[in-house]
A protein has these predicted regions:
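Glycine-centered flexibility motif
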Residues: 1-3, 62
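Compact nucleic-acid interaction/catalytic patches
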Residues: 3-8, 13-51
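C-terminal terminal-subdomain/extension
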Residues: 46-107
Length: 107
């Protein structure tokens, strides 16, 4: 019997795309990107597990993929909020916001 497996992937939710139920969110994927050739020098933001312990990352180094924004429906989300990144790491948030603005206004 064939089975479809699903892989859990972390996202950084940026904002609500709309306020109707079910809600859509604009989100940035968080990935380990093991193949260095697949990393974008500027728009894959490295986050070290030791520097950001409250994000509960599973990998020593993960990347917030600024240039890979996706729309995620709340029905596809199954985990609770891991961390309030705005409150925990405001400097990281400022950097992410600047890169988002730069990338999406210059395409």
């Amino acid at each position: 019997m064939n089975r479809i497996d699903y892989k859990s992937r972390p996202f950084l939710i940026i904002k609500e795309a709309d306020d109707r139920f079910p809600k859509d969110y604009n989100a940035l994927p968080v990935s380990k990107i093991t193949d260095r050739s697949r990393r974008h020098v500027k728009y894959d933001v490295a986050i070290n597990k030791n520097d950001y312990p409250n994000l509960n990352l599973t990998q020593p180094i993960s990347f917030i993929r600024i240039h890979k924004m996706q729309t995620v429906n709340e029905k596809d989300l199954y985990a609770a909020i891991v961390s309030d990144i705005d409150a925990e790491y405001p400097d990281l948030v400022v950097n992410i916001k600047l890169l988002i603005e730069e990338y999406y206004t210059n395409f």
